[in-house]
């Protein structure tokens, strides 16, 4: 039971953190607490529910039981992330939040944990400035994924009883990671502390390679790294394997570098890590992958496994282990895909490939893949919501329409303009779920006159959610002079300091903003830091955005700049950003060799 007599929730106008779990008096940004059914989007409604649940979970995980030291930050944040998903899913099962958890939390965590510059979930902290840096996707998302994996391993009933034991024993006190493992292990009657040690105290995660010969499969685990070194050979995880052969499912623990297992049926297809409960990737031999492709095409495999196989395949293209053309051929099996996460993840990959290669001679070929797949989504969903459609359709629809517009679909751009003109006459005429998409596309094909309209709308907007939609539009023009105007506007009083990173991040991913943003950042760095305030965690996002606009040749220049302009608390982010730049440049070079 909640131990205090009251729990207040307070909206704060300018707040760098999204929310703060003060015991009995949780504080939030206005946009993360205040929901208006008439003007708020489906995404906003969902995000508010998740953040409120996250902060309420902290009343137990963080407040009732508090970590002993910062190395166990995950006991607070991983649990709040995990429990928030569980809570919202309980109230709104139709939102398919656990599916979205895979697409958002697991993808984000794996993206960071695949870097050499990542860190373990349980990480040493030696200086106060290092504390801010570990409030990242490892402490939140990877930890949440590992807890989900553990729950599946010990069963949800044992997991719940173990948590109750842990909270009761350590109430109004401090705890460490091993205290949690003792409580859950005692209930589950399994030595989970040894298994969890490899996931909590060891940086990174494994990729499991599998080769099949008849009913025999040979498995090998190595650390998955985007930038491979000798250290990739280090590390052994205790991996809970779930092998699905269609009519039979078996569970195993892989605790060696290499291991062999026997399938129940040498004639049947199989998939490992079914349901993607484990925090690891799979690399199948080519024959197994071909067989799985047929099962994907016919939708014999469930949608999570369809998502998982494509997601793992793409990740190996980025590292150079698989050829991109083979991956693109493989994606043909998904052109009748109708599930949210499976469709969205593939659409994002295809669009990001176009963004990466848009200056190359062969980019039209990749652009066509992205266009065709986005068009199949659009043809299925259309512009307007249908009665009783899935909650996630609104999220997927906006991505597909936005992507098509930016790829030059004239029909989409014309319809966006038509709906925007109606909106100017009657703001209730445009669905909240489509507003940002329409605004962004109108700006994308707009001019100075359009810019003035959005600036006026921004200044007149009453809600922060609406202001942020218009600000997104101001970041979406193609003209350099208009984007520079937006950046200068960001430094002024009309944009709250809590939002300073948003226009920079938006323009960093704008194909036309990439060309000049780094130069602008260098010139205005002191103004940015002054407005944000030294120590503001949002500055890490500004540093990370640099990775979108530079290439590996500029690494020395960037390091020289930050040596002259040091910013305590962003050192780890800078190293991770530089590594991502090297990985991206290497990936582009490998694509050039393959397609030239």
Regions found by a protein language model. Give the residues of each.
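Solvent-exposed serine/threonine-rich low-complexity stretches and specific carbohydrate-binding patches
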Residues: 252-256
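Long, ordered, helix-rich scaffold segments
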Residues: 107, 137, 218, 229-231, ...
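Surface-exposed ligand/attachment interfaces on beta-rich extracellular proteins
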Residues: 258-260
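Short coil-to-beta strand junction motifs in C2/discoidin
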Residues: 232-238
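Hydrophobic alpha-helical and helix-loop surface patches within well-folded domains
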Residues: 1-230, 348, 352-353, 359-372, ...
């Amino acid at each position: 039971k909640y131990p205090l007599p009251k729990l207040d929730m307070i909206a704060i106008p300018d707040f760098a953190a999204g929310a703060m779990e003060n015991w009995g008096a949780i504080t939030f940004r206005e946009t993360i607490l205040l929901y208006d059914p008439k003007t708020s989007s489906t995404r906003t409604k969902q995000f508010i529910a998740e953040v409120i649940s996250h902060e309420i979970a902290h009343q137990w995980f963080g407040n009732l039981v508090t970590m002993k030291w910062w190395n166990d930050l995950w006991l607070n944040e991983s649990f709040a992330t995990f429990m928030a998903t569980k809570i919202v899913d309980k109230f709104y099962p139709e939102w398919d939040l656990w599916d979205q958890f895979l697409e958002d939390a697991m993808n984000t965590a794996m993206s960071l944990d695949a870097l050499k510059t990542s860190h373990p979930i349980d990480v040493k902290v030696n200086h106060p400035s290092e504390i801010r840096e570990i409030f990242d996707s490892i402490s939140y998302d990877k930890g949440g994924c590992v807890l989900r994996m553990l729950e599946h391993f010990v069963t949800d009933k044992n997991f719940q009883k173990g948590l109750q034991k842990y909270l009761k024993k350590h109430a109004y006190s401090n705890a460490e990671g091993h205290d949690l493992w003792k409580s859950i292990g005692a209930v589950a009657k399994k030595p989970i502390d040894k298994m969890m040690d490899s996931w909590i105290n060891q940086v990174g995660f494994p990729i499991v390679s599998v080769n099949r010969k008849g009913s025999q499969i040979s498995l090998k685990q190595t650390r998955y790294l985007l930038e491979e070194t000798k250290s990739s050979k280090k590390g052994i995880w205790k991996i809970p394997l779930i092998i699905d052969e269609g009519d039979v499912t078996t569970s195993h623990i892989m605790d060696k570098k290499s291991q062999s297992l026997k399938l129940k049926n040498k004639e049947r297809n199989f998939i490992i890590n079914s349901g993607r409960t484990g925090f690891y990737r799979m690399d199948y031999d080519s024959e197994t992958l071909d067989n799985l492709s047929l099962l994907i095409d016919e939708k014999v495999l469930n949608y999570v496994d369809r998502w998982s196989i494509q997601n793992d395949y793409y990740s190996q293209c980025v590292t150079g282990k698989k050829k991109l053309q083979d991956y693109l051929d493989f994606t043909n099996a998904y052109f009748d895909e109708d599930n949210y996460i499976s469709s969205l993840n593939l659409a994002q990959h295809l669009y990001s490939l176009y963004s990466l290669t848009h200056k190359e001679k062969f980019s039209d070929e990749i652009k066509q893949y992205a266009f065709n797949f986005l068009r199949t989504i659009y043809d299925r969903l259309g512009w307007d919501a249908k009665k009783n459609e899935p909650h996630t359709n609104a999220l997927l629809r906006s991505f597909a329409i936005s992507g098509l517009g930016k790829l030059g679909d004239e029909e989409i751009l014309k319809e966006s303009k038509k709906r925007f003109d109606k909106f100017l006459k009657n703001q209730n005429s445009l669905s909240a779920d489509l507003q940002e998409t329409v605004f962004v596309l109108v700006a994308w094909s707009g001019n100075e006159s359009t810019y003035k309209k959005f600036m006026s709308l921004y200044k007149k907007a009453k809600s922060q959610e609406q202001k942020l939609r218009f600000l997104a539009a101001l970041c979406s023009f193609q003209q350099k002079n208009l984007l520079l105007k937006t950046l200068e506007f960001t430094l002024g009083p009309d944009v709250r300091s809590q939002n300073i990173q948003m226009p920079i991040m938006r323009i960093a991913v704008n194909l036309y903003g990439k060309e000049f943003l780094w130069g602008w950042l260098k010139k205005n760095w002191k103004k940015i830091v002054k407005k944000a305030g030294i120590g503001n965690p949002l500055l890490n996002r500004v540093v990370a955005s640099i990775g979108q606009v530079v290439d590996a040749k500029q690494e020395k220049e960037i390091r020289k700049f930050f040596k002259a302009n040091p910013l305590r608390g962003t050192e780890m982010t800078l190293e991770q950003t530089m590594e991502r730049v090297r990985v991206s440049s290497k990936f582009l070079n490998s694509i050039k060799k393959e397609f030239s």
